[in-house]
């Protein structure tokens, strides 16, 4: 072997050794946060999460994706097109069961739980001029029930079924995101909107400052007919401008969900960082005040991701 050949062989050996210690380009962790419409609560909370992860997970690249929310988010996770997503609990349950009528092609068996976060209040709001004050008053009126194949739309179906009504009782049904629904009401082209979101959602606040509204009650007796995971709650008086009295309605828990393909360490860090940065979450939207690690496993409808499980064991929440 010539000296030049020996030098080349040595260089190749050193290069190979260094390669074994270098960080491959594929090790960069991309984190796509699946949220909902930009006028809802999922979106600002998702932005906050993205910023928390970008600053706390070394080598991560984060992105926030606006979607049609729960159903779309869960389908995207199953396809590996997101790393963490917001979803309503009943949607998660139906996805795990493979409920095709709810918009799932089959059992979404790759989904894994991260945390229960805050309740979504089912908020039915009508313009005062529409005369709609009760669920029965919606008969013959126009109502937006949320984007097609969204968790909100599934909530709408459950509420009407419990009340002995269906979409056929309405004058017109629109399948629109929150902000678009509000714009139609402002323009007198729609009577009411049903929005499943955290209290103080921006779209309804916007509507309430633009015209007089009625917040329509969903009586506790109707909520009881639906059963779990729905619970009877109250929208406090003055949550929205002109809402002088507390209003009964239903609520469903929200969850953060991931999928089995996301590495354990990444999910561990995502879970840990969220709970360590709750003030930033609350600053993005007041709904985050309800996020509590002690309640993070309440009602979890699917198996936990090992990374989340590791965090809860370290925190003493899971034995």
Describe the function of each predicted region.
Residues 104-117, 122, 239-248:
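A structural signal for short loop-to-beta-strand junctions that line the ligand-binding cleft
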Residues 89, 100-101, 130, 166-257, ...:
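Pocket-lining segment of extracytoplasmic ligand-binding domains
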Residues 173-176, 180, 186-187, 197-210, ...:
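An extracytoplasmic/periplasmic, membrane-proximal ligand-sensing/linker region
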Residues 1-12:
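Bacterial N-terminal signal peptides that target proteins for export
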Residues 30-56, 60-61, 120-187, 279, ...:
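Bilobed "Venus flytrap"/periplasmic-binding protein-like clamshell domains
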């Amino acid at each position: 072997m010539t000296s030049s050949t020996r030098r080349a062989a040595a260089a190749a050996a050193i290069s190979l050794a260094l390669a074994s210690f270098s960080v491959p380009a594929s090790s960069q962790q991309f984190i796509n946060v699946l949220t909902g419409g930009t006028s809802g609560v999922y979106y600002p909370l998702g932005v906050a999460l993205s910023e928390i992860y970008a600053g706390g997970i070394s080598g991560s690249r984060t992105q926030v994706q606006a979607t049609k929310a729960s159903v779309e988010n869960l389908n995207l996770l199953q396809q590996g097109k997101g790393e963490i997503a917001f979803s309503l609990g009943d949607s998660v349950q139906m996805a795990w069961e493979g409920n095709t009528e709810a918009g799932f092609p089959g059992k979404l068996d790759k989904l894994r739980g991260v945390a229960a976060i805050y309740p979504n209040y089912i908020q039915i709001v009508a313009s005062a001029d529409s005369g709609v004050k009760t669920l029965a008053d919606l008969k013959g009126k126009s109502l937006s029930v949320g984007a097609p194949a969204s968790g909100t739309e599934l909530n709408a179906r459950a509420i009407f079924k419990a009340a002995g009504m269906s979409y056929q009782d309405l004058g017109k049904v629109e399948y629109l995101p929150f902000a678009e629904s509000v714009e139609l009401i402002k323009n007198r082209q729609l009577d009411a909107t049903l929005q499943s979101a955290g209290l103080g959602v921006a779209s309804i606040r916007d509507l309430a400052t633009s015209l007089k509204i009625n917040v329509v009650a969903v009586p506790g007796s109707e909520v009881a007919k639906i059963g779990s995971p729905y619970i009877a709650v109250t929208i406090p008086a003055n949550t929205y401008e002109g809402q002088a009295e507390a209003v009964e309605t239903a609520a469903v828990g929200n969850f953060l969900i991931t999928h089995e393909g996301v590495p354990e360490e990444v999910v561990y860090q995502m879970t840990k960082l969220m709970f360590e940065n709750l003030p930033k979450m609350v600053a993005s939207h007041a709904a985050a005040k309800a996020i509590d690690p002690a309640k993070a496993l309440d009602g979890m409808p699917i198996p936990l991701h090992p990374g989340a499980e590791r965090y809860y064991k370290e925190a003493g929440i899971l034995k």
